[in-house]
C-alpha cells in the first residue's frame, strides 16, 4: 500500500546586520527610516514565500483526510458495489438481498420486511446464487458454479424450504450429484425447470417427479432451451432460450442445431500431464451457421409440442430468431432476422394452432440494430408499442416510440409515432392502460444520460420526465423496473455518483424509499482523491461528438500530463456516459497523474443511426480516423504532453487500438491490447457479417479491415499484448497470428499470457492483470528527466 509521506516546509528569515561605514570617524548615525523600510520589505518577501509554498503544496499534504486511490483499494470489501438483485414478486412485494447478505421481502405499501433467508445459509451450502419461488416458500441455491461463456454457467443445486429448513438435491431421474446447465423457478407456485445434457426437464412442484420435455439434446450439437455460443454472445445476449407463458401452462423454447457448424478447440494447459481440449461450435465469418427451430410445449395434460414456422419469405433462406415474448396465455410474438441482418419480420403466433401472422417488417441498407427489443402489448393485444427509426431532418434517423393499432377484422395495422427529436428512446418499460401512459428511458436530457419519461398515448402526447429531479446532483443515468400492474417501480440510479436503488409509487414518484444506498462504498470514495470528468464536444464531418477527460484531483492546467486513450469494447457502444466508474484506470489517474480520455466517434451508439452506421463496410477505418482527430485536438491543449501518449483497448477496442498504432500517424509512445481481434475472418459470423458482409463477396473489405497487414507500422511503439489461452470469444489464435506477423516484420513486443483464462479473467487473476497493465503504463508514461552532464571541477 502506498503511503503519502508527510512533508513540512521551514522558511527562516534572518534580520539584516547593521554595517558600520569604513573610514568614517563620525559617530554612527542610524537611518531609522531606511531600516524600517528594509524590514518591511523582508517581511513581505517572507510572507509571499510562505504563501506560495502553501499554494504549491499538493492537496494530499494539505488535506490529510484524502488519500490517493491504490490498486489494493479496488479489491477491498468497502469498494465493492452492492447489487441488491431486487425483483418484483407481485404488485406490492419486492425480494432483494441486503448489504449484509440476508434475502428479504419488502412490502412497499406497509414498509414491512420479512426475512426469507439468512446470510449464514449461503455459507452452509457454499452457495453463490439464489432464486426465491413465486409462492415465497422455497429457495433454489446454486453451488460449485463454473462460468462457461459470458452469461452461461454450470452448477449443482439444492432446494431449501424457508419455513422448515428441509433441503432437497435437484437431480434428473436416476442421476446423483448432477451438474446442471440451468435451473430456475417457473412463473406460478413451485414450478421448476432445469436443463441437463441439453435437454429440458420440468417439475410442476418440488414434490413431483421430473418430466423430460425434450430428448434430442446432444452435447455441443443440439441445444434445447439454452443458447449455443453464437446465440448467447451475439444474438440473444443471454444463455436462456426458453420463455414461460404468463399462466405457466406453456413453454416456448429454441432448438439450436450445430451439427454442421465447424468447431473450435480450446486447449487446457494446466492441471494434467497431457493437455485436454474443449471443443465447441463456433461459426466464423462466412462459415456454416446453426439452424434454429421454435417450439411450444403444453405442460398440462398430455404433453404436446408444436413448431412455430418462420415467415414464408424466410423459409428458403438462413435466418436468426432474436426475440420471443408471450403476448397472452396462448399467443407469442417472435422476431425473425435474415443472416445479412438487414431484414426483420415480427410475427404474432397462436400457439394452440401454430398459425403465425406478420405484424411488421423492417429493412435497412446497412444493418438493423435493437433486434432484441421486446414490444409492449396491451392486455387485449389490440395495440403494441416498440421503437422504430424515425428520420429527424439532416441529423438522420433516431429510435422513437411508435404505437401499432391492430384492426381486429382486417388485421391491418395503423402506426402512430408518440415521440420525436434528435435523441434516442433506449427502452420501453411499461404501458399503463388505466392512465393511457407509456413509460420509457431516453437520452432527451443528455446523450450521456438516461432518464425515465412517461408519454400520453392519447390526445396531445404530453411527455413528462419522472426521474429528472430525483437526486439530480447524484443521478443522471437511470434504469427502471415496473411492478406487474405498474403501480410502483424500482429506480436504479447508475451514476455519475455512487449507485442507489429506490422504490417509487407511479402516482407520486416524489415519494420514495431507498432500498440500497451503497453507503460503505460512498464513504470509501469520499476519502479518496478522485476528480470529476470534463466533457468537450468535437466537430467532425458535421457531427458533434463527445470527448471525456478524467483529470487528476489536483489538476493544474499549467502542468504537463501524460494521456491514456481508452477504446470501446464493441461497435455501437458508448464510452462517454454519466455511469459510475471506478477501475484500474482510476488508479492510473490518481497514482501517476495521467489524464484518461474516452471519445465516442462514428460507429458509437445512442446518438442516432447516422453516426452508428458510418462504419458499415468500413470497420477499422472511420473509427481510427476519428480517434486520431480527437488526439490531435487534445495535443492543442497546453497541459497534454505530446511525448507521453498511450492507448488501450480490449476485444474490438484492442482491434481499433492496433489499427491506430500501425497507422501513419505516429502519435503514441506505447499501447496495450487485451484479447485483440486481429482478423475479422477469424471472428464470429453474426458479428463480422453484420458490419462487413460475407467474406466471399467482400474479400477486399475484409483485407482492408485486417490488423495483420502492414504491421511494420508498429515498429516505433512499445506494445503490450495480453491474452488468456482459454478465451472462447476472441480466440488466442488472433494474438498468435499477430505475433507471427510482428516477428516476420522485426517488431518488438511484450506478451502477457494467462493460461486457461477466458475473455474476462477470473477473480484470482484480476489483481495480476491490473498490476501488469498499470506497471506497463506507469513505466511508459513517467516523465523523462534529462540529466545534465557534470562539469569537471577546476583545480584551485
From Swiss-Prot:
It comes from Homo sapiens. Its main location: membrane. May form oligomers. Interacts with KCND1. Interacts with KCND2. The chain crosses the membrane at residues 35-55. This is Inactive dipeptidyl peptidase 10. It comes from the Eukaryota. GO terms for cellular component: membrane; plasma membrane; voltage-gated potassium channel complex. InterPro entries: AB_hydrolase_fold, Peptidase_S9_cat, Peptidase_S9B_N, Serine_Prot_S9B/DPPIV. Belongs to the peptidase S9B family. DPPIV subfamily. PANTHER family: INACTIVE DIPEPTIDYL PEPTIDASE 10, PROTEASE FAMILY S9B,C DIPEPTIDYL-PEPTIDASE IV-RELATED. Residues 56-796 are extracellular. The modification Phosphotyrosine is found at residues 138, 143. It is a single-pass type II membrane protein. Glycans are attached at residues 90, 111, 119, 257, 342, 748. Residues 1-56 are annotated as: Mediates effects on KCND2. Residues 1-34 are cytoplasmic. It is found in: Cell membrane. N-glycosylation is important for cell surface expression, specially at Asn-257, which is crucial. Found in serum, T-cells and brain (at protein level). Expressed in brain, pancreas, spinal cord and adrenal glands. One of its GO terms (biological process) is proteolysis. One of its GO terms (molecular function) is serine-type peptidase activity. Keywords: Asthma, Cell membrane, Glycoprotein, Membrane, Phosphoprotein, Signal-anchor, Transmembrane, Transmembrane helix.
Amino acid at each position: 500500500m502506498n503511503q503519502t509521506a508527510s512533508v513540512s516546509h521551514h522558511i527562516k528569515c534572518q534580520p539584516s546586520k547593521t554595517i558600520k561605514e569604513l573610514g568614517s570617524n563620525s559617530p554612527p548615525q542610524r537611518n531609522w527610516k531606511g531600516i524600517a523600510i528594509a524590514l518591511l520589505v523582508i517581511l513581505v518577501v517572507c510572507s509571499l514565500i510562505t504563501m506560495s509554498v502553501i499554494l504549491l503544496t499538493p492537496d494530499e499534504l494539505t488535506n490529510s483526510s484524502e488519500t490517493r486511490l491504490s490498486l489494493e483499494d479496488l479489491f477491498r470489501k468497502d469498494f465493492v458495489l452492492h447489487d441488491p438483485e431486487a425483483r418484483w414478486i407481485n404488485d406490492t412485494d419486492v425480494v432483494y438481498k441486503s448489504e449484509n447478505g440476508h434475502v428479504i421481502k419488502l412490502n412497499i405499501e406497509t414498509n414491512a420486511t420479512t426475512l426469507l433467508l439468512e446470510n449464514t445459509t449461503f455459507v452452509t451450502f457454499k452457495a453463490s446464487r439464489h432464486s426465491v419461488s413465486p409462492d415465497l416458500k422455497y429457495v433454489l441455491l446454486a453451488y460449485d458454479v463454473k462460468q462457461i461463456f459470458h452469461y452461461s454457467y454450470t452448477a449443482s443445486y439444492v432446494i431449501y424450504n424457508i419455513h422448515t429448513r428441509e433441503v432437497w438435491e435437484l437431480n434428473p431421474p436416476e442421476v446423483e450429484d448432477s451438474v446442471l446447465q440451468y435451473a430456475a423457478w417457473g412463473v406460478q407456485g413451485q414450478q421448476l425447470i432445469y436443463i441437463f445434457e441439453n435437454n429440458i426437464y420440468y417439475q410442476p412442484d418440488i414434490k413431483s417427479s421430473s418430466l423430460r420435455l425434450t430428448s434430442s439434446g446432444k452435447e455441443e450439437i443440439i441445444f434445447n432451451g439454452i443458447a449455443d455460443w453464437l446465440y448467447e454472445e451475439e444474438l440473444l445476449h443471454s444463455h436462456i432460450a426458453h420463455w414461460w407463458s404468463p399462466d405457466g401452462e406453456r413453454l416456448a423454447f429454441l432448438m439450436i442445431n450445430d451439427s454442421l457448424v465447424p468447431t473450435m478447440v480450446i486447449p487446457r494447459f494446466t492441471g494434467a500431464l497431457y493437455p485436454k481440449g474443449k471443443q465447441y461450435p463456433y461459426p466464423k465469418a462466412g462459415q456454416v451457421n446453426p439452424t434454429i427451430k421454435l417450439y411450444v410445449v403444453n405442460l398440462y395434460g398430455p404433453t404436446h409440442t408444436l413448431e412455430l414456422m418462420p415467415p414464408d419469405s424466410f423459409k428458403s433462406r438462413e435466418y436468426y430468431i432474436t426475440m420471443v415474448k408471450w403476448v397472452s396465455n396462448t399467443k407469442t410474438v417472435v422476431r425473425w432476422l435474415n443472416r445479412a441482418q438487414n431484414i426483420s419480420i415480427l410475427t404474432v403466433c397462436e400457439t394452440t394452432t401454430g398459425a403465425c401472422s406478420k405484424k411488421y417488417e423492417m429493412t435497412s441498407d446497412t444493418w438493423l440494430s435493437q433486434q432484441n427489443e421486446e414490444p409492449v402489448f396491451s392486455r387485449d393485444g389490440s395495440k403494441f408499442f416498440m421503437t422504430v427509426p424515425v428520420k429527424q431532418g439532416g441529423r438522420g434517423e433516431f429510435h422513437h416510440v411508435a404505437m401499432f393499432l391492430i384492426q381486429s377484422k382486417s388485421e391491418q395495422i395503423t402506426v402512430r409515432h408518440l415521440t420525436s427529436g434528435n435523441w434516442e428512446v433506449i427502452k420501453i418499460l411499461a404501458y399503463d392502460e388505466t392512465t393511457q401512459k407509456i413509460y420509457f428511458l431516453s437520452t432527451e436530457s443528455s446523450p450521456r444520460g438516461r432518464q425515465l419519461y412517461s408519454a400520453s398515448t392519447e390526445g396531445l402526447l404530453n411527455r413528462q420526465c419522472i426521474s429528472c429531479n430525483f437526486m439530480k446532483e447524484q443521478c443522471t443515468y437511470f434504469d427502471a423496473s415496473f411492478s406487474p400492474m405498474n403501480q410502483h417501480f424500482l429506480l436504479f440510479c447508475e451514476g455519475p455518483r455512487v449507485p442507489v436503488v429506490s422504490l417509487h409509487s407511479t402516482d407520486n414518484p416524489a415519494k420514495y424509499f431507498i432500498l440500497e444506498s451503497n453507503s460503505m462504498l460512498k464513504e470509501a470514495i469520499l476519502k479518496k482523491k478522485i476528480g470529476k470528468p470534463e466533457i468537450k464536444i468535437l466537430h467532425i464531418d458535421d457531427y458533434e461528438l463527445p470527448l471525456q477527460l478524467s483529470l487528476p484531483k489536483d489538476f493544474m492546467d499549467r502542468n504537463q500530463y501524460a494521456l491514456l486513450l481508452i477504446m470501446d469494447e464493441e461497435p455501437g457502444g458508448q464510452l462517454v456516459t454519466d455511469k459510475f466508474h471506478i477501475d484500474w484506470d482510476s488508479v492510473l489517474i490518481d497514482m501517476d497523474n495521467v489524464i484518461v480520455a474516452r471519445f465516442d466517434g462514428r460507429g458509437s451508439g445512442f446518438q442516432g443511426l447516422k453516426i452508428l452506421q458510418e462504419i458499415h463496410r468500413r470497420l477499422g477505418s472511420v473509427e481510427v480516423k476519428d480517434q486520431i482527430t480527437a488526439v490531435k485536438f487534445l495535443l492543442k491543449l497546453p497541459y497534454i504532453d505530446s511525448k507521453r501518449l498511450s492507448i488501450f483497448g480490449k476485444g474490438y477496442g484492442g482491434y481499433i487500438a492496433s489499427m491506430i498504432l500501425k497507422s501513419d500517424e505516429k502519435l503514441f509512445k506505447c499501447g496495450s491490447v487485451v484479447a485483440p481481434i486481429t482478423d475479422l475472418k477469424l471472428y464470429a459470423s453474426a458479428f463480422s457479417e453484420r458490419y462487413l458482409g460475407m467474406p466471399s463477396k467482400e474479400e477486399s473489405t475484409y483485407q482492408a479491415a485486417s490488423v495483420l497487414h502492414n504491421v511494420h507500422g508498429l515498429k516505433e511503439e512499445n506494445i503490450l499484448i495480453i491474452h488468456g489461452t482459454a478465451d472462447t470469444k476472441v480466440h488466442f489464435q488472433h494474438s498468435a497470428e499477430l505475433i507471427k506477423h510482428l516477428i516476420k516484420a522485426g517488431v518488438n513486443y511484450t506478451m502477457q499470457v494467462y493460461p486457461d483464462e477466458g475473455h474476462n479473467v477470473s477473480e484470482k487473476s484480476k489483481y495480476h492483470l491490473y498490476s501488469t497493465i498499470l506497471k506497463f503504463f506507469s513505466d511508459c508514461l513517467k516523465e523523462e528527466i534529462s540529466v545534465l552532464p557534470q562539469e569537471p571541477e577546476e583545480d584551485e
